[in-house]
Amino acid sequence: MPLWGLLLALWGCSTFSLPADTAAFRRIFLKKMPSVRESLKERGVDMAQLGAEWSQLTKTLSFGNRTSPVVLTNYLDTQYYGEIGIGTPPQTFKVIFDTGSANLWVPSTKCSPLYTACEIHSLYDSLESSSYVENGTEFTIYYGSGKVKGFLSQDLVTVGGITVTQTFGEVTELPLRPFMLAKFDGVLGMGFPAQAVGGVTPVFDHILAQRVLTEDVFSVYYSRDSKNSHLLGGEIVLGGSDPQYYQENFHYVSISKPGSWQIRMKGVSVRSTTLLCEEGCMVVVDTGASYISGPTSSLRLLMEALGAKELSIDEYVVNCNQMPTLPDISFHLGGKAYTLTSADYVLQDPYNNISCTLALHGMDIPPPTGPVWVLGATFIRKFYTEFDRRNNRIGFALAR
């Protein structure tokens, strides 16, 4: 072998032990905001009644009969957003980066005046962009809390300093709930092409096609600092995982359903007893969701083990004095137990020091999409998460 070939081979082997070249990463800084649920509580809304209404709506949407993919997130509890630019010059939007979906959409200046939720958000104006290209194809995306409708357009989209030509949705019908009180404008799906409504190529796939990233991965960090929880957010890293955000090594789990960030779980245990999912079940790792959710019957069993009281199918509470004595909950993924303590799954309400809400919700999604569990920000805050498109796997490491 020529000397240069030997040196190249040795260099290639050595890169496995070198620290990540963090300078090559593209970063999207995230901000944490009060969730829609928190805003509704502050306004005295009966969350039990609202939960019942949305449960009924979920049933009437007939998810299993839809030809379009169903997004599992209802955004009631979403707390993290980042900023992107659309158009020339860029129009700035606050978006949720959601691994549970694959489309990008923002409200449009063409939004009907009947939808007052549009009025409080930034609106995309195609007339103000010199790079706009008309498409016009109508689309509908169904969520756990309703649906958004609009039409497709094409323009330049800038994410983490990378600009791509992107087909996206201009939303003209935006539901009052939850979007009237949402602090974000739209959603940027980080899912797979198979999940995209209208056959649209997702933003991340366009970024991968440019070959500007070191690795075909992105990773998500959510801050766990509770002292100034609404002032801190997190970061999405495109092209790798930043060692400053995690400790120990990554443990990887292969995706179980092609074209989805879904993996197989082999049990949910309290203390040392496996209560649920002992024979295996499906779980989606969803950056657009804030809490952990599962089938309502399973959640009720889990809540009984914790001694929690059910306010509605999507909200459970405990006496705040119980928090130090509540047991750990472990989720078994890829042969490893990922454990949350009560400090991880109990939410302390600044307006109520008597009843504390648990970051665990019931959610029934019928076949073929469900039944499925969802691991949201409650889980990701504890375990820094890497989404690996090249190897079709998800990695978890203990967050710093």
From Swiss-Prot:
Disulfide bonds join 111-118, 277-281, 320-356. The active site is at 98, 286. The keyword Methyltransferase does not apply. GO terms for biological process: angiotensin maturation. It is an enzyme of class 3 (hydrolase). InterPro entries: Aspartic_peptidase_A1 (IPR001461), Aspartic_peptidase_AS (IPR001969), Aspartic_peptidase_N (IPR012848), PEPTIDASE_A1 (IPR033121), Peptidase_aspartic_dom_sf (IPR021109), Renin-like_dom (IPR034135). Interaction with ATP6AP2 results in a 5-fold increased efficiency in angiotensinogen processing. It catalyses: Cleavage of Leu-|-Xaa bond in angiotensinogen to generate angiotensin I. It comes from the Eukaryota. Residues 18-59 form a propeptide. One of its GO terms (cellular component) is membrane. PROSITE patterns: ASP_PROTEASE, PEPTIDASE_A1. Residues 80-397 form the Peptidase A1 domain. The keyword Disulfide bond applies. Glycans are attached at residues 65, 135, 353. It is found in: Secreted; Membrane. Its main location: secreted. Interacts with ATP6AP2. Belongs to the peptidase A1 family. This is Renin. It comes from Ovis aries. The lineage of its organism: Eukaryota, Metazoa, Chordata, Craniata, Vertebrata.
